[in-house]
Design a protein with these regions (language model features):
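Gly/Ser-rich "nucleophile elbow"/oxyanion-hole loop immediately N-terminal to the catalytic nucleophile
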Residues: 77-80, 127-162, 170
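C-terminal catalytic-base region of ester-bond hydrolases, centering on the histidine
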Residues: 222-350
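The feature captures the conserved acid-bearing segment of alpha/beta-hydrolase catalytic domains
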Residues: 177-249
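Catalytic nucleophile-loop/oxyanion-hole region of alpha/beta-hydrolase
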Residues: 95, 116-136, 143, 200
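N-terminal cap/lid segment of alpha/beta-hydrolase-fold proteins
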Residues: 30-80
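Bacterial Sec-dependent N-terminal signal peptides
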Residues: 14-37
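Short amphipathic alpha-helix adjacent to the substrate-entry channel of hydrolases
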Residues: 96-115
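Short beta-strand element of the alpha/beta-hydrolase
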Residues: 81-90
């Protein structure tokens, strides 16, 4: 099994670092000269707009990954602990620069994010999970003046999204984190290890969930995300399954491939409107109880949730939201299929 996982990882590395070109804005947008690819700029106000905090960073040696540092991004000038998001990266995304826009967005909004690298090769899946977990635990233990464990989110992409559920269960159940707010935000999910069906059915009642899949992803079978979404005990009112599709403008294409979001290959309006905007609202709803935020993050297909921006009168593809997802494509489309022998939940493939 170890050899086959190493082959998978090699394939992941080829796919983790590419993304095409995109475009958007919640109103009809004119071309603005900023650092985003494509003609559509960031939201200027509301959810998804940049916060006012400057970003500070602390690094400390990884407890299990020799020579690597765990990084904590937080609002500069913090004088009291802030709510925290523990981020689990995809295969090959060991450097925070790969998705630095996301981490800085979180810190600018006044929250903390912990980025923990794990080895891409030479270790087992379980060892990667342990590296993530021990890194998160050390951050909490060593920086109580920055991290407030009463309000906690777990977020991840691909391998990291699959890991989110086991890690969140440890944090929420074993450690009691998140008593005043809990959520999970899973993107382009890979296989989920180290979590049983009974554990999936035992998440605390204040846990929220956004699961995102990307229509042109040919890496991870959407059935992996569908399985966990349907089997977790979070009620439909507190979770949404979201599909993002590409948008083609005359001069730019906003893609919805496996590597959405990332800051390296194409940092664009899809990062902001498709991911940051929903995350921003999810944080506000989960941590502050703002019901208006719920309509954006978990709106069950509300206009406020699904509407993407326009450019020169052409609207970008709206988000597609459901509580009862089904697979749109055959497993043969994907490199990592639900029926793959390395899937510990293979019995749940439909």
């Amino acid at each position: 099994m170890k050899a086959s996982i190493l082959l998978m990882i090699s394939f992941f590395l080829l796919l983790s670092c590419s993304k095409n070109e995109p475009d958007e804005s919640n109103q009809d947008a004119a071309s603005i000269d900023d650092d985003l690819a494509g003609p559509i700029s960031r939201p200027k106000a509301g959810y998804g707009s940049d916060g006012n905090y400057q970003v500070a960073k602390i690094s400390f040696p990884s407890p299990l990954y020799s020579g690597k540092n765990v990084e904590i991004f937080y609002p500069k000038g913090t004088i009291s602990p802030k709510p925290v998001i523990f981020y689990s990266h995809p295969y090959g995304g060991e450097l925070s620069e790969y998705n630095i826009g996301l981490y800085e967005f979180i810190a600018k909004k006044g929250y903390v994010v912990v980025f923990a690298p794990y080895p891409t090769t030479g270790v087992t899946v379980e060892e990667r999970y342990d590296t993530l977990w021990q890194s998160f635990k050390k951050a909490v233990r060593d920086y109580p003046g920055i991290i407030d464990t009463k309000k906690v989110g777990f977020m991840g992409h691909s391998f990291g999204a699959g890991a989110c559920f086991a890690l969140a269960h440890r944090g929420f159940i074993d450690e009691g984190w998140g008593e005043n707010g809990r959520f999970i935000f899973a993107m382009a999910q890979w296989y989920s290890y180290e979590i049983t069906q009974a554990e999936l059915q035992s998440f605390p009642e204040n846990t929220k969930l956004i699961t995102q899949v990307y229509n042109d992803d040919i890496t991870n079978d959407h059935r992996l995300a569908i399985d966990i979404f349907k089997n977790i005990n979070i009620p439909d009112t507190e979770k949404d399954f979201i599909l993002i599709k590409k948008s083609v403008l005359p001069t730019f294409t906003y893609t919805a491939e496996h590597n959405l979001p990332n800051t390296q290959s194409s940092y664009d309006a899809y990062d902001y409107y498709g991911i940051y905007r929903l995350l921003d609202a999810m944080i506000d709803y989960s941590f502050n109880g703002n019901t208006a935020a719920k309509n954006v993050a978990l709106g069950n297909g509300s206009k406020e949730q699904v509407t993407m921006p326009s450019y020169n009168g052409q609207a970008l593809s709206p988000l597609e939201v459901t509580d009862n997802p089904s697979a749109l494509y055959p497993q043969s489309k994907y490199s990592f299929q639900c029926s793959g022998l390395n899937n510990p939940r293979i019995a749940n493939c439909n």
